[in-house]
Amino acid sequence: MDESLQSEELLDPAKKFTYVAPAGLDDTYVVFVIGETTRWDHMGMLGYERDTTPKLSKEKNLVAFRGESCDTATKLSLRCMFVREGGTMNNPGRTLKEQNVFAVMKELGFTSELFAMQSEVWFYDNVNANNFAFREQIGSEKRNQGKAVDDMLLVPEMKASLDRFPKGKHLVILHTKGSHYLYSQRYPRSF
């Protein structure tokens, strides 16, 4: 991987562009879920003919995008998924040219925490979160002993994060294992 650009050398969209938030957003909470291998064209809430997202469709204030990945590997997709189009170099390593949206949100006054069922530590570190924990850390916590190490362990992490940051602008990023092989061994039939 070409990692020749340091974070201080990256374009900072927060400095180049202006965003003025509407009044009344002092206490704003954003939960951002990175859902692995979920295709927008198979989600009922985004127009798929079958109702594949009945619970998500009922959520208030939910925003879903018809996004596409720039690559098939998580490591490379994470590089370009959270920057503007053209924010990475067109090379095999997808070298970043600008800061990702999460680093920009931090500059705009958001606190943030990231919890993941994967181990892309290089990416989590570049988010500039106040705290992050990944699969091996979360799964080894005493409170999780005897539990299946699956995406559902992210729910109590999210709740605890919201409790730790009860006021202000706060972002919680959840990186799921999603539909990666072998789905049937990671989720109960009831799911």
Set out the residue ranges of the language-model regions.
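Active-site-proximal alpha/beta segments of enzymes that process anionic O-linked groups
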Residues: 1-32, 37-191
